[in-house]
């Protein structure tokens, strides 16, 4: 959520940000509501002053033994009017708040302006894509041929965009997740968390999934709970309605969870394989930072994700998302895209974002300055570290051999019982 004072004092800043995001939201709606709310509050204050004056006149008349019935009647009318205006002001405030919940974050000044993914800016590339002496296959062909990925039985169990992992594939998925977690905990200083995989509506609102993106979520209607689309949701909201100590910042949490997404609007995209699933595993990184240091933390978090890819020997590139392609809650986002030789292109495997105080305002997460003073909103950051299924895809495609086998990257072998090569 944006700062109310910014909307009131500098609506042109917000209007410019919305234009950069190519949003059709009209800032005039807020201005109209805010003007109406202020007018109601002014009228209420005026009537309260009138009520106080009338109360004093009633008391004076009673002390003098005079008839105060007319004054009392007038006082009752003023009180009823105040009550009605208070209710109207609350209704306008609620409508204003609902409107504010639909407004995306303001892009940071370093974010390139653009409409969509075609306007994103490449920052760097790491690693050289392998030159194959044969035509590289796509991961679903490799996984099925080696008996590890079973899309047919998954379809029988749950329908499209689900997968059953067998034997080495199940172990490789687990190995990747454990390697990611161990690295984040031991090398990067994150605290591991195992959060609920279902959350309530308030929690989804805190990180920005609601109210605008409900169609992308799986909802348990009888409880009005939602399956998490990412561990960012529960991890960020761990400190909702709390005041942290400045000396404890930055805080870093990591979690391995299943993620559930309806993939609304993705009809016909990535219909084969593991790239776009209704359920997938991801290891998430979340950080709470001091406002003055949050962009340093973004670079650090991006480095944590990059190091995993480098240790796995997977070529990748880093992209800065343009203003029109960023997520709703982000003020700046880097995407890491891994090279997939079977598809002959880079595909997203991690997204690292600084959300500024946007989520903290929605979830009411603040910190108390070390020197005293009024609590301030923290800055929240989140990043994939990494998407496990997509990393498995990258391992299969980059380490495939002409005989159909797949070499296991060295860093994963301790997690695979020393296995060096996957064969049928």
Curated annotation (Swiss-Prot):
This protein's domain notes: Consists of two distinct domains, a catalytic core and a N-terminal extension that is involved in tRNA binding.
Enzyme Commission designation: 6.1.1.11
Pfam families: Seryl_tRNA_N (PF02403), tRNA-synt_2b (PF00587)
Binding site for L-serine: 230-232, 284, 384
Reactions catalysed: tRNA(Ser) + L-serine + ATP = L-seryl-tRNA(Ser) + AMP + diphosphate + H(+); tRNA(Sec) + L-serine + ATP = L-seryl-tRNA(Sec) + AMP + diphosphate + H(+)
A molecular function GO annotation: ATP binding
Protein name as annotated: Serine--tRNA ligase
Organism: Nitratidesulfovibrio vulgaris (strain ATCC 29579 / DSM 644 / CCUG 34227 / NCIMB 8303 / VKM B-1760 / Hildenborough) (Desulfovibrio vulgaris)
Keywords for the protein's UniProt record, in alphabetical order: Aminoacyl-tRNA synthetase, ATP-binding, Cytoplasm, Ligase, Nucleotide-binding, Protein biosynthesis
Location relative to the cell: Cytoplasm
Subunit composition and interactions: Homodimer. The tRNA molecule binds across the dimer.
Protein biosynthesis among keywords: yes
Family label: Belongs to the class-II aminoacyl-tRNA synthetase family. Type-1 seryl-tRNA synthetase subfamily.
Annotated metabolic or biological route of this protein: Aminoacyl-tRNA biosynthesis; selenocysteinyl-tRNA(Sec) biosynthesis; L-seryl-tRNA(Sec) from L-serine and tRNA(Sec): step 1/1
One GO CC term, this protein: cytoplasm
Gene: serS
Biological role stated in the UniProt entry: Catalyzes the attachment of serine to tRNA(Ser). Is also able to aminoacylate tRNA(Sec) with serine, to form the misacylated tRNA L-seryl-tRNA(Sec), which will be further converted into selenocysteinyl-tRNA(Sec).
Keyword rRNA-binding applies: no
Gene3D superfamilies per UniProt: Bira Bifunctional Protein, Domain 2, Serine-tRNA synthetase, tRNA binding domain
GO BP, sorted A to Z: selenocysteine biosynthetic process; seryl-tRNA aminoacylation
Amino acids binding ATP: 261-263, 348-351
Listed InterPro entries: aa-tRNA-synt_IIb (IPR002314), aa-tRNA-synth_II (IPR006195), aa-tRNA-synth_II/BPL/LPL (IPR045864), Ser-tRNA-ligase_type_1 (IPR002317), Ser-tRNA-synth_1_N (IPR015866), SerRS_1_N_sf (IPR042103), SerRS_core (IPR033729), tRNA-bd_arm (IPR010978)
């Amino acid at each position: 959520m944006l700062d109310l004072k910014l909307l009131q004092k500098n609506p042109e800043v917000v209007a410019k940000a919305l234009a950069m995001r190519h949003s059709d939201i009209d800032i005039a709606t807020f201005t109209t509501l805010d003007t109406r709310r202020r007018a109601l509050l002014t009228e209420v204050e005026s009537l309260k002053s009138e009520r106080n004056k009338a109360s004093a006149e009633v008391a004076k008349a009673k002390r003098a033994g005079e008839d105060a019935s007319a004054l009392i009647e007038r006082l009752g009318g003023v009180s009823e009017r105040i009550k009605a205006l208070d209710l109207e002001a609350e209704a306008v405030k609620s409508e204003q708040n609902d409107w504010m919940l639909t407004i995306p974050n303001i892009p940071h000044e370093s974010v390139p302006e653009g409409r969509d993914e075609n306007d994103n800016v490449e920052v760097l590339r790491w690693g050289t894509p392998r030159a194959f002496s044969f035509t590289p296959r796509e991961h679903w062909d490799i996984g099925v041929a080696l008996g590890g990925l079973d899309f047919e039985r998954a379809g029988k169990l749950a329908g499209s965009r689900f997968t059953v992992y067998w034997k080495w594939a199940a172990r490789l998925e687990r190995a990747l997740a454990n390697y990611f977690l161990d690295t984040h905990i031991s090398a990067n200083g994150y605290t591991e968390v195992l959060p609920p995989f279902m959350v309530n509506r308030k929690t989804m609102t805190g990180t920005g999934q609601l109210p605008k993106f409900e169609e992308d979520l799986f909802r348990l209607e009888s409880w009005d709970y939602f399956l998490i689309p990412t561990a960012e949701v529960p991890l960020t909201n761990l400190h909702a309605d709390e005041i942290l100590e400045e000396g404890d910042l930055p805080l870093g949490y990591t979690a391995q969870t299943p993620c559930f997404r309806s993939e609304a609007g993705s009809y016909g995209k990535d219909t084969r394989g593991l790239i776009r699933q209704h359920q997938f595993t991801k290891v998430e990184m979340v950080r709470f930072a001091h406002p003055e240091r949050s962009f340093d933390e973004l670079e650090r978090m991006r480095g944590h994700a990059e190091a995993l890819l480098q240790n796995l020997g997977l070529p990748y590139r880093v992209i800065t998302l343009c203003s029109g392609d960023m997520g709703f809650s982000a003020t700046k986002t880097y995407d890491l895209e891994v090279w997939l030789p079977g598809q002959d292109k880079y595909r997203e495997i991690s997204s690292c974002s600084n959300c500024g105080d946007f989520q903290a305002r929605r979830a009411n997460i603040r910190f108390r300055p070390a020197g005293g003073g009024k609590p301030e909103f923290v800055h929240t950051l989140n990043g994939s570290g990494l998407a496990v299924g997509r990393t498995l895809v990258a391992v299969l495609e980059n380490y495939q051999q002409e005989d159909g086998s797949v070499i296991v990257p060295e860093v994963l072998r301790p997690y695979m019982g020393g296995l060096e090569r996957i064969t049928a």
